[in-house]
């Protein structure tokens, strides 16, 4: 099933996007900072969420990992 129609898969994709953008911004900040608006601004916003809400994002990643491991 597609990640759009499955809520758990959609949350997993969003969490991975946030974590990946925050990691890329920590390595090369200029790559995401030049695109703050428009379609590519989504990646900058995800990086900001990952930086500012990092304890919450980490907790959500742990919960999601446990859910994926122990579901079914």
UniProtKB/Swiss-Prot annotation:
It is a single-pass type I membrane protein. Disulfide bonds: none annotated. Keywords: Glycoprotein, Golgi apparatus, Membrane, Signal, Transmembrane, Transmembrane helix. Residues 1-26 form the signal peptide. The keyword Electron transport does not apply. The chain crosses the membrane at residues 54-71. Glycans are attached at residue 35. One of its GO terms (cellular component) is Golgi membrane. It is found in: Golgi apparatus membrane. Residues 27-53 are extracellular. It comes from the Eukaryota. InterPro entries: KISH_domain (IPR051523), Ksh1 (IPR009653). One of its GO terms (biological process) is intracellular transport. Its main location: Golgi. Residues 72 are cytoplasmic. Involved in the early part of the secretory pathway. Belongs to the KISH family. PANTHER family: PROTEIN KISH-A. This is Protein kish-A. It comes from Danio rerio (Zebrafish). The gene is tmem167a.
